[in-house]
UniProtKB/Swiss-Prot annotation:
Designated name of the protein: (4S)-4-hydroxy-5-phosphonooxypentane-2,3-dione isomerase
Subcellular locations according to the entry: Cytoplasm
NCBIfam families associated with the record: PRK10486.1
InterPro entries in alphabetical order: ABM_dom, AI-2_Isomerase_LsrG, Dimeric_a/b-barrel, LsrG
Length: 96
């Protein structure tokens, strides 16, 4: 299992817009073959900080995810909402 944890920080006045932009990515991602989990989390202490927990069957399904229209649209729209680049950490999923 291929797991990615992504931290995304957005401008405080863009939180609602971020949630709507990412909702579309979430809805598309959970329908993908090979997607095991796609959670969007909001930091309770920093309202404008989000974490995305993505679990995919393998690297091929991750590669496919990055070709989908919902992913590409989301990434393009995120640029103006973020305070800096996304931070990604990769993990090997052992016990889902």
């Amino acid at each position: 299992m291929h797991v990615t944890l992504v931290e995304i920080n957005v401008h405080e006045d863009k939180v609602d817009e971020f949630i709507e932009v990412f909702r579309q990515n979430h809805l598309g991602s959970v329908q993908e073959e090979g997607n095991l989990r796609f959670d969007v989390l909001q930091d309770p202490e920093v309202n404008s900080r989000f974490y995305i927990y993505e679990a995919y069957k393998d690297e091929d399904t991750v590669a496919f995810h990055k070709t989908t229209p919902h992913y590409k649209t989301c990434v393009a729209k995120l640029e103006s909402l973020m305070t800096g680049p996304r931070k990604k950490r990769l993990f090997n999923g052992l016990m889902p």
